[in-house]
């Protein structure tokens, strides 16, 4: 990473950690919908600084919430999913986001019965719905941001006035 990547890295780390630890919990069955998952689609714009930032943010949030050894593997799974979103950005950010949902939901389906003692079917439905809600909210934000970004890029510099 270059020096100019440090800003987005810190911002995405803070978004995940503060969003998960600082905001009220949103429960969906047995799973907590993590606000920190919302900016996952933005890795298509901000690249690996966002991938590393969200991964570190998840690690920090897990230290504050569920510090079990198995739960500490979650950032590695998340990193792989975020890297998939980044790699698929030129093909389809939505496809990358769906792959992220499937990967992380599968991991959470395995993790929740171990850490919470709930049934696998409840874990699967809770994790899938929770991840889908959070990631698709983020995808909506990404879609708006990318359209604004495209319209700003299409504006000739000569038409911009400063007053």
Task: Map each language-model feature to its residues.
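Membrane-embedded alpha-helical hairpins and interfacial helices in multi-pass inner-membrane proteins
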Residues: 21-34, 38, 59-163
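Interfacial helix-start motif at the membrane-water boundary
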Residues: 44-57, 65-71
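Hydrophobic transmembrane alpha-helices
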Residues: 1-52
């Amino acid at each position: 990473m270059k020096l100019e990547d440090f800003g987005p890295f810190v911002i995405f780390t803070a978004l995940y950690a503060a969003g998960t630890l600082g905001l009220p919990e949103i429960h969906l069955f047995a799973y907590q919908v993590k606000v920190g998952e919302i900016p996952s689609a933005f890795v298509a714009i901000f690249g690996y600084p966002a991938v590393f930032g969200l991964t570190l943010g998840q690690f920090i949030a897990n230290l504050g919430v569920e510090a079990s050894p198995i739960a500490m593997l979650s950032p590695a799974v998340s990193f792989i999913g975020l890297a998939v979103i980044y790699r698929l950005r030129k093909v389809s950010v939505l496809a990358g986001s769906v792959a992220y949902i499937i990967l992380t939901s599968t991991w959470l389906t395995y993790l929740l019965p171990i850490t919470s003692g709930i049934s696998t079917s409840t874990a699967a439905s809770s994790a899938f719905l929770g991840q889908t809600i959070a990631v698709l909210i983020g995808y909506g934000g990404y879609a708006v941001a990318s359209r604004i970004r495209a319209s700003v890029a299409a504006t000739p510099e000569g038409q911009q006035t400063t007053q």
